[in-house]
Amino acid sequence: MQTYTLGNPACNFAPGTLDSVQKPARVLIAASMSLVAVFAMTGCAPDRGPFPVPASSDSDTPVVETPTPTPTPTFNKQLFSVDDPASIWVVVDKLRPLNPQNYAAPDLVSLPVINANPSKLRQEASDALVVMFNAYTAETGLKMASQSAYRSYAAQVSIYNSNVGRLGQVGADLASARGGFSEHQTGLALDIAASPANCTLNQCFADTPQGQWLAANSWQYGWILRYPNGYTDITGYQFEPWHYRYIGVLASTEYHLEGATTLEGFFELPPAVDYAG
């Protein structure tokens, strides 16, 4: 006898089996055979195991790109010359005289502010000073004045010689510059006073409302305190809380952000404690 074999042994049967069964039973068996066919497609189908799962490929994995960080802009300290006497970044100290030493600043204008003495500055510095003085008055109701601004070579020689007579050469070298070595000769430096006068050209000016405001805010207008307290071993001069230097808002902002204290340090120049000769 031939046996019909399905994938599952439990579903196998032999031919002729139905002929020996009574009709009613055959009907039941026929119905059962229909179920067998279903089983053949399901439970009685040949064992094939689970369907294989396709292996994932690297190309199916989303690629996450790491953004390239934007480099922090570097302040260009070579944008303007520190040697050219006409540059607003010129650095003048005991090792860096003006060239020529009798240099006369261009585009000088009379300062349209309160003046203790007739004062002039270069146009750009003058404009910035007016804005700064007006901002101070608007904020505090108080006033500032120009004590001394541009000085010619001859005027600086006269002032220095006068100080030598009063203070001796060592004292004069701490208190004033020799002719050809003064920032005042650039038309970019200013001695500032309170108005009415209070601690004029004295270190106590640092404690006045004007002196305190300037120390905190002058950088916003392009000005810096040139000879700060405790830096004589770099600048060569005693503390002068009244002496401010214009370098422009671009440089003064960077100067402030870096926490710089002297132009020598800011521009990585050597200390200028004394004259070379």
What feature does the model see in each segment?
Residues 2-5, 13, 26, 41-149, ...:
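Extracytoplasmic cell-surface/polysaccharide-interacting catalytic and binding patches
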Residues 10-11, 15-31:
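Bacterial N-terminal signal peptides that target proteins for export
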Residues 31-40:
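Bacterial N-terminal signal peptides
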